[in-house]
Amino acid sequence: SHDFASRLIEEYAPLFRSRSFNIGGDETFDLGRGRSVQDSPGASRDELYADFVKDLCSTLAHRGLQPMLWADIALENPHTMDLLPGDITMLNWMYEPDIDESKIQTIASQGRRQFVCPAVRAWSRFFPDYDGAWLNTYRMAVAGLKYGAEGMVVTDWGDYGHVNDPRLSVPGLCYGAQNAWNPVAIDACEMNHRISNLAYGDESGWLMDSLARIDSDGVSFPWDLAVQVLELEYGSGTGMLNTDVASYVERSCGGELMFDRALGCADARRRLLLRNHARLERRRDCDRALIDCGSAVVAVLDGSARGGLNPELLWVMLDGQRLFNRLGEELLVLAGGEDACGTKDVTGRALDASRRARLAADLELWFERYRVQWLSIGRYAELARIAHVVWSFADILRRGAL
């Protein structure tokens, strides 16, 4: 892997003017397992990590490049940080609204260079969490200034296929620009009014208020939960439980042991859906919020595209969330939560199957609209992964079984 990474550095470094090169190094979940153990018996995880990073830094040094490294693994253990070269710029990322300031202090106390790295909080969402993004960027900037960080990197990324459209990240980038330049306590509402005017030409200042409500008020079945439900199956059509995904979901739920490994995928999906039944039951209220917010934004846009936002993109993403809200409700019915959900028709299962089939078709048609938006600004990349999620759920709906 070192030889491969070094070849990538040799190929990519000449393409950029910058003398700084980010070697990554974050979230090394499999370190100390498999081949890394076989190749270095007796080495600790700290030593395995530090040795690999030092080798990459040596490759960069031969080209006169300055290494940058995501700081999360080094911060897990002070010994790891001690083993790393002193000339690395640490990229200290924290993406939650409530940050852990001590992580910034730890790097500063070692005299190391660091950038603070907040996020626009768009991953695994049809619309970003704008409220959380504002708090995250503001608090990271304030803490970075306090402990002498040399700069800030605002991150925008996606999980599970990157369903989030980068054009919707413009407000988050504006938050980052404001806070990197001058992190003063500005009310979030005031900042949103400024962005409404500056980025979207809305002199009333209210467009961002409607956009910011979408993620908080309009989501009953979020993209990440949908993908977790889907990926609980090991392979396609096997009915077997993916124990790695099951363990990840349990860790995400505070370590609660939710799944019986002996009962397979369908039982695990049922348990996960029923655990989230209160959220899934909010579908009707969420859909009303989506329609209200979308109508308000479209009225301001008045048929034009501003700041990368256009009415068609807006409705494609809103309709995607509305369809996934309906999907969550139908999956809850299949999980046995129909009484709580109130969607099972008194005429029986045949009409339920008809309703599910219509939703399956609506999801497939929606994806074609989404595909047009995706390809209007980029190449195929991860689009096939999103297609797999949509088409797999369409199959489940038509089959009528988890």
Question: What spans do the regions from the language model cover?
Answer:
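Substrate-binding groove of N-acetylhexosamine-processing glycoside hydrolases
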Residues: 2-20, 27, 38-402
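Surface-exposed loop and adjacent secondary-structure segments within mature catalytic domains
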Residues: 32-33
